[in-house]
Amino acid sequence: MEKNNEVINSIQEVSLEELDQIIGAGKNGVFKTISHECHLNTWAFLATCCS
């Protein structure tokens, strides 16, 4: 029961804007990450260039 209270308290500390971004309901529904900005070919090259 104590863990449930901790979870509820943690959720209450998150602002509505942060929650929208986390669940993907923000401006365009996308949570920006470094891989979102880059092309797959770039990552494939980096993963295989040193093998």
Swiss-Prot record:
UniProt keyword list: Antibiotic, Antimicrobial, Bacteriocin, Lantibiotic, Plasmid, Secreted, Thioether bond
Keyword flag DNA damage: no
Gene Ontology cellular-component terms listed: cell surface; extracellular region
Localization annotation: Secreted; Cell surface
Location in chain, cross-link Lanthionine (Ser-Cys): 35-49
Residues that make up the propeptide removed upon maturation: 1-25
Cited function: Lanthionine-containing peptide antibiotic (lantibiotic) active on certain Gram-positive bacteria. The bactericidal activity of lantibiotics is based on depolarization of energized bacterial cytoplasmic membranes, initiated by the formation of aqueous transmembrane pores.
Name of the protein in question: Lantibiotic streptococcin A-FF22
Annotated source species: Streptococcus pyogenes
Gene transcribed to yield this protein: scnA
